[in-house]
């Protein structure tokens, strides 16, 4: 399953409890390329009408969902990171995995993607 960064961002946000997610399309002032950002509410974090974290590109944002995992899920996620890195033929250890890989492993650990 190949998900875009936007799809990953929304799936992770929904798994974290974000609701009322709305997309905003605009042109990046620096690059001139089209860009999409999302706003939403997150009752579990007591957040209303805020920009969603950029989970696929930010290790700091990944720390939010990693902090919610049980010890068992943390071990499962580590295993899933290793599997994803091997599929990508990426030799780095799991603890150095990029944010996008962590997001995919989180979604897999939560049973939200195969």
Q: Where on the chain are the PLM-derived regions?
A:
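Glycine-rich anion-binding surface patch
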Residues: 1-114
């Amino acid at each position: 399953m190949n998900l875009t960064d936007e799809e990953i961002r929304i799936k992770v946000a929904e798994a974290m409890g974000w609701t009322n997610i709305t997309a905003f399309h605009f042109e990046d002032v620096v690059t001139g390329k089209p860009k999409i950002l999302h706003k939403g509410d997150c009752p579990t974090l007591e957040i209303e009408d805020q920009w969603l974290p950029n989970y696929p590109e930010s290790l700091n944002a990944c720390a939010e969902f990693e902090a919610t995992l049980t010890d068992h899920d943390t071990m499962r996620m580590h295993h899933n990171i290793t599997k994803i890195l091997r599929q990508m033929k990426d030799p780095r250890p799991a603890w150095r995995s990029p944010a996008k890989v962590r997001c995919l492993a989180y979604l897999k650990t939560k049973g939200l993607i195969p």
